[in-house]
């Protein structure tokens, strides 16, 4: 006789995301669906109807986690092309490139990853590339993605340099590796497994411009058994402006609950430590509020145009000035019973004005917060940065998550992966002030 449940999970500590505390309980699964959830211990009849029973006494059983800001396109750079992690000289490097070219025959650039600048000198490597590959673009990324070895052919075609090696500058190569099906199929599969192993089952993924064709692969995956990560993706305008035609097409194309278009994403100001965060009042011992101007008029125009068509925006802001300007913009968006209809968000929110947080909470803005970012620097470095840039008085409102929560904002965790790899324990620790 066929059993009702494919699996029953019994847990001493079950956290369902609805109740504030965990409790003893069990889950009954049929295939990939939870069909029953109850407190207490299961009756013998329930167990007899299960193909498999899992019993957890010390572990916490909980729903999958959502990371609200990930960047698979940047993560893939760690593994793109040939592996140069053990290369120490030009001869080895040239040999690996020749083998890769003969095996893969790429139409565009020859790509590589894992280069160690301490093992293989960049200048020597680039001289070899000019001699051996004068007519083929070559780009070899360092192990941490912060720089690269490249030839002049690559500089001319892709319009960036080893000194400006960051995603927004090398976006022109993304179409090539995102459409390399042999590479991307395994890479995205490994990415999903890595995220699942960390408890993540849903991501809000950033894709530059029109995602350079990667949505074709997502469409193929949508109803596949190979999809283990719900993917809600946003368009971040980089090589072109906001594209509402593309947005409409994506909204029509993805209508299920596994993959969906989620709107637009954009950076506004920069970090406060670099004096590029936009402040309401000048920096300590300075006469300016931000080193670089922020095009708020352009941002407002895009946000209101997208909002008119019911698309979301997520704006990345770090200074209280930037957060304040975004607050003003969001107040002009469509509302239903006083709350934003399209659930716009602000990312990071490093330093904020409590008055703005109250308004943001009142209109229903979501905060996408990089909790783990506090792990990147020692506490004394962070404290000194705050003292030097905004001072101790304003510093009271740095990472003011308590006020965000009290004001009614919806707080969500993000990593900007691969800046940080999602860690639930670290996120909990740092979100509570660790």
Could you tell me what each predicted segment is?
Residues 175, 186, 304-314, 321-344, ...:
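His/Asp/Glu-enriched, well-ordered alpha-helical/loop segment
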Residues 221-224, 249-259, 307, 337-339, ...:
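Acidic (Asp/Glu)-rich catalytic clusters
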Residues 37-40, 264, 349:
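Residue-level recognition of beta-strand microenvironments
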Residues 134-135, 253-259, 283-288, 359-383:
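Extended low-complexity acidic/polar segments
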Residues 125, 219-221, 248-250, 279-281, ...:
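Short secondary-structure boundary/capping segments
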Residues 145, 235-239, 265-268, 350, ...:
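Glycine-rich beta-alpha junction loops
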Residues 71, 258-276, 365-375:
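Non-cysteine beta-strand/loop elements that form the S-adenosyl-L-methionine
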Residues 2-11, 15, 19-246, 271-305, ...:
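Divalent metal-binding segments
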């Amino acid at each position: 006789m066929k059993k009702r449940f494919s699996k029953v999970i019994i847990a001493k500590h079950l956290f369902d995301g609805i109740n504030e505390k965990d409790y003893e309980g069990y889950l009954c699964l049929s295939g990939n669906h939870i069909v029953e959830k109850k407190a207490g211990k299961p009756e013998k009849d329930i167990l007899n109807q299960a193909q498999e029973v899992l019993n957890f006494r010390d572990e916490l059983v909980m729903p999958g986690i959502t990371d609200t800001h990930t960047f698979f396109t940047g993560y893939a750079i760690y593994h793109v092309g040939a592996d140069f992690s053990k290369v120490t000289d030009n001869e080895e490097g040239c040999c690996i490139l020749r083998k890769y070219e003969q095996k893969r025959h790429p139409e565009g650039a020859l790509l590589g990853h894992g280069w160690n600048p301490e093992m293989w000198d960049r200048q020597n490597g680039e001289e070899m590339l000019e001699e051996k590959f004068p007519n083929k673009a070559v780009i070899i990324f360092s192990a941490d993605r912060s720089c690269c070895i490249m030839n002049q052919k690559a500089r001319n075609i892709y319009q960036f340099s080893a000194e400006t090696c960051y995603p927004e500058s090398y976006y022109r190569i993304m179409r090539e590796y995102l459409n390399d099906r042999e590479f991307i199929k395994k890479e995205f599969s490994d990415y999903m497994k890595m995220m699942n192993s960390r408890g993540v089952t849903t991501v809000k993924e950033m894709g530059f411009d029109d995602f350079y064709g990667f949505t074709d692969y997502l469409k193929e995956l949508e109803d596949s058994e190979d999809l283990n990560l719900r993917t809600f993706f946003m368009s971040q305008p980089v090589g072109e402006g906001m594209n509402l035609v593309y947005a409409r097409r994506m909204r029509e194309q993805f209508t299920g609950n596994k993959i969906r278009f989620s709107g637009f994403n954009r950076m506004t100001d920069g970090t406060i430590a670099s004096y590029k965060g936009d402040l309401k009042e000048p920096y300590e011992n300075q006469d300016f509020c931000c080193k670089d101007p922020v095009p708020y008029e352009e941002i407002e125009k895009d946000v209101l145009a997208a909002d008119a068509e019911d698309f979301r925006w997520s704006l990345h802001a770090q200074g209280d000035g930037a957060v304040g300007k975004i607050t003003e913009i969001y107040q002009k968006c469509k509302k239903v019973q006083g709350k934003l209809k399209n659930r716009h968000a602000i990312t990071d929110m490093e330093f904020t004005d409590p008055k703005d947080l109250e308004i943001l909470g009142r209109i229903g803005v979501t905060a996408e917060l990089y909790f783990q970012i506090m792990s990147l620097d020692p506490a004394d470095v962070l404290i000194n940065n705050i003292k030097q840039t905004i001072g101790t008085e304003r510093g009271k409102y740095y990472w003011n998550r308590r006020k965000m929560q009290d004001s009614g904002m919806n707080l969500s965790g993000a990593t900007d992966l691969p800046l940080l790899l999602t860690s639930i324990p670290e996120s909990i620790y740092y979100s509570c002030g660790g």
